[in-house]
Amino acid sequence: MELDALDRKILEILLKDSRTSYREIAKDLNVAVGTIYNRIKKLEDSGVIQAFTVKLNYESIGYDLTAIIGIKAQGKKIREIERIIAKDKRVTCVYDVTGEYDIIVIAKFRNREDMNRFVKGVLSIDGVEKTNTHVVLEIVKEDFRLEP
């Protein structure tokens, strides 16, 4: 979908705070509330906006450990393995990638024991050949909100 300047401005506002009311957006952009409603509805219907959500501080709710896990898998099993892993609530991202590993997973854990159980569970999935786990020491930037 091609975005015009108004669509982009609406998205920028919603990316900063998805709770911003249509009335506030309309006032900021000097357009009618109905225009904002229609534009946001169009953005939702076309799949540009997939959800209105919050950005959590995971450490504040007990997820103190972030890991990046490379997974080498048998070619025919990759999609199935990705689907299984994606169902785990601790997993934030599953990527099908090129390179030494076939799958990259980013996940949040409460502690090392929780991570250890997860990795051993991944290794028990049929078709997983090996994993390589990197523990994140410090999150410098973690923000998936790209400017439209």
Swiss-Prot record:
Residue spans binding DNA: 22-41
An example Gene Ontology CC term for this record: cytosol
Keywords for this protein: DNA-binding, Transcription, Transcription regulation
Protein name: Uncharacterized HTH-type transcriptional regulator PH1692
InterPro entries associated with the record: ArsR-like_HTH (IPR011991), AsnC-type_HTH_dom (IPR000485), Dimeric_a/b-barrel (IPR011008), Tscrpt_reg_AsnC-like (IPR019888), Tscrpt_reg_AsnC/Lrp_C (IPR019887), WH-like_DNA-bd_sf (IPR036388), WH_DNA-bd_sf (IPR036390)
GO molecular function: sequence-specific DNA binding
GO biological process, one term: response to amino acid
Domain HTH asnC-type stretches: 3-64
Gene3D superfamilies, A to Z: 3.30.70.920, Winged helix-like DNA-binding domain superfamily/Winged helix DNA-binding domain
Organism: Pyrococcus horikoshii (strain ATCC 700860 / DSM 12428 / JCM 9974 / NBRC 100139 / OT-3)
Keyword DNA-binding (UniProt): yes
